């Protein structure tokens, strides 16, 4: 029997379909009594179990605290951010404090806060 080089083996694998490769792996595991699964590393025990870090917050609410002097500009920005109609956006601005965005990611919350503050509003992110 002729010895097959590694390169020849790789070329053979390139010509196989995923199903054929899967069958090959199963047969290889069976013949050589090995497993192709990656070993799972055991997690190291924490040094101080009481010193667990609080999970990082992933969702944020943007809260309009006050509209400021440029109320019309703030209403326009609220409409842009939320997609609300004019009446709904005005009601949201008039009813401060009110949530402009709920459950937004950090980037979206920061961007909305910057837009509203540029329009003259007082905004908080919680």
Swiss-Prot record:
Q: Describe its assembly.
A: Homodimer. Part of the ribosomal stalk of the 50S ribosomal subunit. Forms a multimeric L10(L12)X complex, where L10 forms an elongated spine to which 2 to 4 L12 dimers bind in a sequential fashion. Binds GTP-bound translation factors.
Similarity comment: family membership:
Belongs to the bacterial ribosomal protein bL12 family.
Pfam families reported in the protein's UniProt record: Ribosomal_L12, Ribosomal_L12_N
Phylogenetic lineage: Bacteria, Bacillati, Actinomycetota, Actinomycetes, Micrococcales
Keyword annotations for this protein, in alphabetical order, are: Ribonucleoprotein, Ribosomal protein
Looking at the record's lineage, which domain of life comes first? Bacteria
Supply one GO BP term.
translation
- Keyword Ribonucleoprotein (UniProt): yes
Functional description taken from the UniProt entry: Forms part of the ribosomal stalk which helps the ribosome interact with GTP-bound translation factors. Is thus essential for accurate translation.
HAMAP family, alphabetically?
Ribosomal_bL12
- Sorted alphabetically, which InterPro entries does this protein's record hold? Ribosomal_bL12 (IPR000206), Ribosomal_bL12_C (IPR013823), Ribosomal_bL12_C/ClpS-like (IPR014719), Ribosomal_bL12_oligo (IPR008932), Ribosomal_bL12_oligo_N_sf (IPR036235)
Any one GO molecular-function label of the UniProt entry? structural constituent of ribosome
The protein here is known as: Large ribosomal subunit protein bL12
The terms describing its cellular component in GO are: cytosolic large ribosomal subunit
- Spell out the Gene3D superfamilies in the cross-references: 3.30.1390.10, Single helix bin
Give yes or no: UniProt keyword Ribonucleoprotein.
yes
Which SUPFAM superfamilies does this one have?
ClpS-like (SSF54736), Ribosomal protein L7/12, oligomerisation (N-terminal) domain (SSF48300)
């Amino acid at each position: 029997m002729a010895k097959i080089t590694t390169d020849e083996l790789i070329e053979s694998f390139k010509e196989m379909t995923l199903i054929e490769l899967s069958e090959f792996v199963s047969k290889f595991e069976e013949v050589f009594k090995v497993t192709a699964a990656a070993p799972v590393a055991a997690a190291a025990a924490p040094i101080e179990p009481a010193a667990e870090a609080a999970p990082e917050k992933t969702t944020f609410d943007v809260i309009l605290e006050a509209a400021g002097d440029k109320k019309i500009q703030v209403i326009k920005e609220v409409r842009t951010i939320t997609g609300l109609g004019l009446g709904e956006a005005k009601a949201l601005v008039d009813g401060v404090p009110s949530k402009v965005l709920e459950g937004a990611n950090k980037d979206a919350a920061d961007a909305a806060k910057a837009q509203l503050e540029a329009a003259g509003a007082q905004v908080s992110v919680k």
